[in-house]
Regions:
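Charge-lined substrate channels and their catalytic hotspots, especially those that engage the 3′ end
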Residues: 1-280, 287-333, 372
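Electropositive polyanion-binding surfaces
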Residues: 23, 177, 182-184, 200, ...
Length: 531
């Protein structure tokens, strides 16, 4: 809100007429005040009652928020101003014609009750403040001589009319995205225009394209970002080596999944004269190529992350970088940033050092092959004889680090992850649990150690940083979990959420018992989300 809007809003903490309000705002013109009131009313911040008295919406029992439809008829409204009372329940037929994502004004009624007996706010939509601009996905169907959209989600009306002039080339059976033109009233059906055609409904190609579109994920990069990426070439420039630690002769290698295409981290391990070892965690130095406020930086910021789905990836950076200069492929010079951790026989990190470097990976290893090497596979041990001893020492070090971490009260949920296998056409052919052997756990452990060392460094040197924090479990959620676990012989004290050892004891005892397979997942849902 601007200064006038804020001032008027504050004055309307008590009801008053517009004329009374003007007297408290000398120097503010009649039209300026009228415009201000219009803005505040349109946004749902203030309301006028039948006696023409204006007041903050909450004073008259109104709350503005976002309409969240469900597929079961009822809905919720997420208030603009968050509080500890949660979302507002909207019963069926009290939605006031609102659709998913609309900004609405809710008139609160008497509190209702949740299934567990706790109170919840209920209300009805009094006014639609602003329609959502979100597009709707669905399939084109023909009804006689007319065409309709059959939305993919039941959160929307079952049919939306598609005028022939607004089909956008779509044919019956196509998966499309539409933009609403008219929301309907009485017996008149809503109407929309097709803005994107993805292909035949039900095909893998159309389904994936629709999901990416719905979530604002764009595969193609802007021209300026592509030009910047192309100008970098495919080799590390000669002037980039200066001031970097040269690690090209050291035994550094990557370990990733079988289907991985970009390799952005690598590891190394070497003994020190003082009886300790130096663990090296090396990540691609992307910042050397993606400079602040450049086209690549702006596009990476907009995307936020790479998006992976079975058999494909939509990268945060163009493939020239993600699969090229910033991928630690074997035998090629690559710019990196290294964390060197000096670890003693007791598993304690005595020293951490960080440096920009240039590396040359000696091998592209997979979790599968490293696990086989650790199990003594003769053929692979012979093929990779130059790193077998190092891999075994790495695995032993990871076991030591994990034991020390567990002694500090860490939780090892070890929840299996499903993986979807696809064929060459991208069609799913199998679903299986992703294996998690010693190699997978080893890399997890090393990354945890590196991140902990970086966090410690930032904190010690008072550098501003964003920390990932896990708070203690909620005692009430822990109580529910304790009740579920009790029939299996587990005893948990919900009043001691900070005592993670009692939770790890449950996980240890449940491991390998098919009857208790759900316990790790239920415990995960009882924990506070990282923030």
């Amino acid at each position: 809100m601007d200064s006038l809007d804020q001032k008027v809003f504050e004055l309307l903490a008590r009801p008053q007429r517009q004329e009374e309000l003007r007297r408290q705002l000398p120097g503010v013109g009649k039209q300026a005040l009228a415009d201000c009131i219009q803005r505040l009313t349109a946004s749902g911040k203030i309301v006028k009652n039948k006696k023409n008295r204006l007041a903050q919406a909450a004073h008259y029992g109104y709350i503005a928020g976002t309409f969240l439809a469900t597929e079961r008829g009822f809905a919720f409204v997420a208030p603009d101003e968050k509080d500890d009372k949660g979302d507002i329940f909207i019963p069926p037929h009290a939605d006031g014609g609102a659709w998913q994502g609309d900004h609405v004004l809710v008139r609160l009624g008497e509190d209702g009750r949740r299934r567990d007996g706790t109170p919840r706010r209920e209300g009805e939509v009094a006014r639609i403040l602003e329609r959502s601009r979100a597009e709707i996905l669905g399939a084109v169907r023909q009804r006689g001589k007319s065409f309709v959209l059959e939305p993919s989600s039941k959160k929307y009306p079952s049919e939306i009319v598609l005028p022939k002039a607004h089909l956008g080339g779509a044919q019956p059976g196509d998966k499309v995205a539409v933009r609403m033109m008219y929301y309907g009233e009485g017996r008149v059906l809503p109407q929309a225009a097709v803005v994107q055609v993805f292909g035949k409904n039900g095909t893998m190609q159309a389904s994936i394209a629709a999901i990416l579109h719905e979530n604002g994920i764009q595969e193609a990069f802007p021209e300026d970002a592509q030009q910047q990426a192309g100008s970098l070439g495919d080799r590390v420039p000669a002037d980039a080596y200066a001031g970097r630690r040269d690690l090209r002769d050291e035994l550094i290698f990557t370990i990733d999944g079988d289907s991985a295409k970009d390799f952005d981290d690598a590891v190394s391990l070497k003994p020190l004269a003082n009886g300790r070892v130096q663990l090296g965690v090396h990540i691609a130095d992307v910042s050397h190529y993606v400079t602040p406020d450049s086209p690549l930086d702006a596009e990476a910021y907009r995307r936020g992350t790479s998006v992976y789905y079975p058999g494909h990836v939509v990268p945060m950076l163009p493939f020239a970088l993600s699969d090229g200069l910033c991928s630690l492929v074997p035998g090629e010079d690559r710019l990196a940033f290294a964390a060197f951790l000096e670890i003693g026989p007791d598993g304690r990190c005595h020293k951490a050092e960080f440096a920009k470097s240039v590396i040359r990976s000696k091998a592209r290893m997979t979790y599968n092959n490293v696990n086989k090497i650790l199990d003594g596979d003769a053929e692979l041990c012979k093929k990779y004889d130059f790193l077998v001893d190092t891999a075994r020492k790495m695995a032993d070090l990871a076991d030591l680090l994990r034991r020390r971490r567990m002694e500090r009260g860490a939780l090892d949920l070890d929840i299996p992850e499903a993986e979807i296998a696809v064929d060459e056409q991208g069609e799913p052919v199998d679903v299986f649990y992703r294996p998690r052997g010693r190699a997978e756990k080893m890399i997890e452990e090393f990354m945890l150690q590196a991140n902990e060392a970086v966090a410690q460094f930032m904190d010690t040197h008072n550098h501003p940083a964003v920390y990932r924090v896990h708070e203690n479990p909620d005692p009430e959620k822990l109580r529910v979990f304790a009740q579920f676990a009790r029939p299996f012989g587990h005893r948990i004290d919900p009043s001691k959420p900070q005592d993670t050892r009692q939770l790890q004891a449950v996980l240890d005892q449940a491991a390998g018992d098919p009857r208790q397979r759900a316990l790790p997942t239920l415990l995960l849902r009882s924990l506070a989300r990282a923030r």
